[in-house]
Amino acid sequence: MKKVMSLLFLSALAAPAFADECTLTVEANDAMQFDTKALSVPATCKEVTLTLTHTGKLPVAAMGHNWVLTSTADFQDVATAGMGAGPDNNYLPKDDARVLAHTKLIGGGETTSISFPTEGLAGKDLTFFCSFPGHWAMMKGSFKVG
């Protein structure tokens, strides 16, 4: 009985730890930089919640940022196509299946969050980036599941 109680106690402590591993925070600034070049979550995460905070002061029209996830093979084509999509579409091609997840564009002092499933992403070569025109070449990084 003592062992069962100990296991129950430990499993109760482990649940929040697993939840935290599936929650990511990224900051972007007015210098066109994310605060990280690599993000990862364990394969045990069925869903990821990502929060993007724009720590700068410039408005969305001048220095907007978002967070977009694609396969690395699709990254450049999606980023290029997004430039023509305009700000109303978050500089992303509308309904493009190559976009695996994305936040909306935000300006200085703003925060946005998204949640997305990880099914089928484990072991894939993935890239995250900002699709605001001119940003994607500098504001990018790798994303790994597992």
Each model region followed by its residue ranges:
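Beta-strand signatures of extracellular beta-sandwich domains
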Residues: 66-70, 129
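Sec-dependent N-terminal signal peptides
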Residues: 4-13
